[in-house]
């Protein structure tokens, strides 16, 4: 699906309403990671250079539909101004006559950042009246917030109903193009790596990927449920008892495509300084828990990853936040960095893992969307993408 982008339309002298994703981590009003703001800069800079008035909308945190200065986008306006090297006008609200006047006064080439759209409960309800008020601030709708594309909210979906021209920003285009090609026309062998704690979060992803991949690697806490489905005793490891039958069905459906761990790092307790050892999957001691894949598994997974032409990774191989149980996840990250094919990291924890390993810049693409990436991998239509124009 080739989306139309800002480059395909005339924006000169137009007010362009851009949904960005500035949902950045803050500590005492200070931005601790500006990755998401940086990711939006190419689209904003293009609009400025083409003589548009860029009106930016975003959410930040979960203010629960009430004004809360803790979640103000003011720090984002300051950081964006530094990145662009020009003034960013910060609006005190995201709707209303005062904001409409402020936007109308801006000359071509200006940037306005609206206050947090989630200060209004109507945003997440996709309230038509609220969406119409947002739409008064622009003539063209640009969605550059892949991270919220799976949400049908007023600023991601509702506002589009009021704008005849609806296109993607460069970040949205990149996400949809790269992940879309991986799922619809991958260079093979195509390998997917699925990890994380729960099978229940990833059932639809696994079902969809089994129809597309050559190999599917399963690690993390969810691997325990699959090992239980294979008949292994799993000690005190996290297992979703109500998903064992589902795991068994997926194993039957996937057959030789699915790779499970053959050894594990187990610990006596869920803490970094607990007693730990490496055991085969058929020898987990009673009362112990699996917290990472073992070295034999890490080597086997790495061999498959390095030989792939397309790799998609969603979810860590273990409790990588604790140093003794990070080796499996970091081994996968290193194998992806060594792989000469297309490597895509999608989903919050895997992104944090490649960044912690210092290997993010060696991936073809690190997705900005957690839940959106997951739903994309499930094969679902994303509301924030479905409303955008497609190239003829």
From Swiss-Prot:
Protein name: Phosphoglycerate kinase
Source species of the chain: Symbiobacterium thermophilum (strain DSM 24528 / JCM 14929 / IAM 14863 / T)
Residues reported to bind ATP: 202, 321, 347-350
GO biological process, alphabetically ordered: gluconeogenesis; glycolytic process
Entry annotated with the keyword Signal: no
PROSITE patterns per UniProt: PGLYCERATE_KINASE
Principal EC category: transferase
Family: Belongs to the phosphoglycerate kinase family.
Gene for this chain: pgk
Molecular functions per Gene Ontology: ADP binding; ATP binding; phosphoglycerate kinase activity
Keywords: ATP-binding, Cytoplasm, Glycolysis, Kinase, Nucleotide-binding, Transferase
Oligomer and partners: Monomer.
């Amino acid at each position: 699906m080739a989306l139309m982008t800002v480059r395909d339309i005339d924006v000169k002298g137009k007010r362009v309403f851009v949904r960005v994703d500035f949902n950045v981590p803050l500590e005492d009003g200070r931005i601790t990671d500006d990755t998401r703001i940086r990711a939006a800069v190419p689209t904003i800079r293009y609009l400025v250079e083409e003589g548009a008035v860029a009106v930016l909308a975003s959410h930040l945190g979960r203010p629960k539909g009430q004004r809360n200065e803790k979640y103000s986008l003011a720090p984002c306006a300051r950081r964006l101004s530094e990145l662009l090297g020009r003034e960013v006008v910060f609006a005190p609200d995201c709707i209303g006559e005062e904001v409409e006047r402020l936007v109308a006064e801006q000359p071509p080439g200006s940037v306005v950042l609206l206050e947090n759209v989630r200060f209004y409960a109507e945003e997440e309800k996709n309230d038509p009246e609220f969406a119409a008020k947002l739409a008064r601030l622009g003539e063209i709708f640009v969605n550059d917030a892949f991270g919220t594309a799976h949400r049908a909210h007023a600023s991601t979906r509702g506002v589009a109903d009021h704008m005849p021209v609806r296109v993607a920003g460069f970040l949205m285009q990149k996400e949809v193009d790269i992940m879309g090609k991986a799922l619809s026309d991958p260079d093979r062998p195509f390998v997917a790596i699925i990890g994380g704690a729960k099978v229940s979060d990833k059932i639809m992803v696994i079902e969809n990927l089994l129809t597309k991949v050559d190999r599917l690697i399963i690690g993390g806490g969810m691997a325990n449920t699959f090992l239980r489905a294979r008949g292994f005793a799993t000690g005190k490891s996290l297992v979703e008892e109500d998903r064992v039958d589902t795991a068994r069905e997926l194993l039957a459906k996937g057959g030789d495509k699915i790779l499970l761990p053959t050894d594990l790092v187990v610990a006596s307790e869920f803490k970094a300084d607990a007693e730990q050892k490496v055991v085969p999957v058929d020898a987990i001691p009673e009362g112990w828990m699996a917290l990472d894949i073992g070295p034999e598994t890490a080597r086997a997974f790495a061999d498959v990853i390095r030989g792939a032409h397309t790799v998609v990774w969603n979810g860590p191989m273990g409790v990588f936040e604790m140093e003794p149980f990070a080796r499996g996840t970091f081994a996968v990250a290193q194998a992806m960095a060594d792989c000469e094919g297309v490597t895509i990291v999608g989903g919050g924890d895997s992104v944090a893992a490649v960044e912690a390993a210092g290997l993010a810049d060696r991936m073809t693409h690190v997705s900005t969307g957690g839940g959106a990436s997951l739903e994309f991998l499930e094969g679902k239509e994303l509301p924030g993408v479905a409303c955008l124009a497609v190239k003829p």
